[in-house]
């Protein structure tokens, strides 16, 4: 994984963990958990592309893998919608910057996951 992406994930997660949004903290904790799982999934896909042995095992369980990939794209869309929702409601510049960066990162990660998945198909 690109070191800038790692830093971006860590930075956003750290800043989100310090926030108290007007909405419930459960929603924010859910977003943080989703971000962490997305990072792990993105890392594992990138590593799979690097190792040809994994390519064959992924192809052998293709139906499960495609379903998992579909779920990750749903999670990304949900996170994007949540970031946009928070951006429309907040007037706090710290929150705006954090969620704009989170939105940008989500779009980059979505693109990377698509690229990895096309290489694995």
UniProtKB/Swiss-Prot annotation:
<comment type="similarity">
    <text>Belongs to the influenza viruses NEP family.</text>
</comment>
<protein>
    <recommendedName>
        <fullName>Nuclear export protein</fullName>
    </recommendedName>
</protein>
<dbReference type="Pfam" id="PF00601">
    <property type="entry name" value="Flu_NS2"/>
</dbReference>
<feature type="short sequence motif" description="Nuclear export signal">
    <location>
        <begin position="85"/>
        <end position="94"/>
    </location>
</feature>
<dbReference type="GO" id="GO:0042025">
    <property type="term" value="C:host cell nucleus"/>
</dbReference>
<dbReference type="InterPro" id="IPR000968">
    <property type="entry name" value="Flu_NS2"/>
</dbReference>
<keyword id="KW-0813">Transport</keyword>
<dbReference type="GO" id="GO:0044423">
    <property type="term" value="C:virion component"/>
</dbReference>
<keyword id="KW-0946">Virion</keyword>
<comment type="subunit">
    <text>Interacts with protein M1. May interact with host nucleoporin RAB/HRB and exportin XPO1/CRM1.</text>
</comment>
<keyword id="KW-1048">Host nucleus</keyword>
<keyword id="KW-0945">Host-virus interaction</keyword>
<dbReference type="GO" id="GO:0039675">
    <property type="term" value="P:exit of virus from host cell nucleus through nuclear pore"/>
</dbReference>
<feature type="short sequence motif" description="Nuclear export signal">
    <location>
        <begin position="12"/>
        <end position="21"/>
    </location>
</feature>
<comment type="function">
    <text>Mediates the nuclear export of encapsidated genomic RNAs (ribonucleoproteins, RNPs). Acts as an adapter between viral RNPs complexes and the nuclear export machinery of the cell. Possesses no intrinsic RNA-binding activity, but includes a C-terminal M1-binding domain. This domain is believed to allow recognition of RNPs bound to the protein M1.</text>
</comment>
